[in-house]
């Protein structure tokens, strides 16, 4: 039996396969183990991956990047609004949904984010099939801990449209622990693990408890203001300043020149993880002027020191939030391509001097490898080396029901607080006037991170054709069951008549 694990990040995607008891990442047709999560549209074709990324300088308005940031979001979502402002590919609202406006000259197309993700998933499936054959379509897909129900559903919809059979969605930190087999080396012991993920656009931190081979998420936090792109941007700004110093031309306002500098800065950043210096040469950067600049690792570290400090302060903040000290952490797992940066690794080691830093698996491969292992567990574990891992996921957001108070104002009741271990079951009694013939239970979610949090409706259950009563109230019992993958089953029952309605919000099948 064979299965697939896929990790879709904001800037890149990676696919791993489980076969013959082992999991490993598969290189794409260009020989790269990580594929840019970029889709470019031309008059006759849709281009995915490195070729799309390389062509964006001349086709920027029809090139979609960072689609994960807008997937499953509405136009009034603050993160979607930020994305729309920054996107070089025009995003509009059409028929109540966000669409990319693609103009290739012959026609104008309106493409939804799910279709973009479908193309990326199709590329991942094609890559997996190169080693497994076309019959292997079972997949486990990773999601950030703070993904909401609508985002999970949109991701699952795109995966199924690409031809995948989605076995489960699992949280990224859980996949990272699976990749290292944490819990198998000391199945009867208890340990606390910090998962440090520095991706392309954000820093995600999680504290996980492993006890007798069982995983539990204790606390988590994401900072969208620190990511690999911010390190690249910092270096690109330095290169622009050096160009201005040498040639008296300020190119910081020139989009084409800055895109070239960003490309060069990204290559240099990668090189500086293994080399002491990197050369940035750009042919005809601006007005026919070539640019050649050597950047040392020491210079890069100095430029990015504020970003390094933010990463370390974020770790300290999460430890405080968890009620832990650095001494309470037993291992640190590194994920995300930018966690390769040597200076960052040294700062983390300094914070946890007695702790094992796990980075033997390439950081941008560890999450899809864990997903492939989970897929192997699900399709049959008789040959799997990591046989007994059991993840206990927890709810990423507050799940609430909406009611009204005595004054008629909206009142929300939290049934599943963020961090509730899954699976879990809750009951809620909704009282409604007996004179009405239908009752609606509305379900909301909230990130619960601050006092100004906003509740977002994601589902409702309507109990109709109820017998009216002249006096009194009727009691409606709502039973909500959330499974380990975050899918939710809701049953509403009229306690007097037994009339019942139910819905299921599936996120992984």
Curated annotation (Swiss-Prot):
Signal peptide (residue range): none
GO cellular component assignments: cytosol; ribosome
CDD domains according to UniProt: ASKHA_NBD_HSP70_HSPA14 (cd10238)
TM segment ranges: none
Keywords: ATP-binding, Chaperone, Cytoplasm, Nucleotide-binding
GO MF term set: ATP binding; ATP-dependent protein folding chaperone
Nucleotide-binding found in the keyword field: yes
Domain of life from the UniProt record: Eukaryota
Location in the cell: Cytoplasm, Cytosol
Family of the protein in this entry: Belongs to the heat shock protein 70 family.
Subunit: Component of ribosome-associated complex (RAC), a heterodimer composed of Hsp70/DnaK-type chaperone HSPA14 and Hsp40/DnaJ-type chaperone DNAJC2.
Name of the protein in its database record: Heat shock 70 kDa protein 14
Lineage: Eukaryota, Metazoa, Chordata, Craniata, Vertebrata
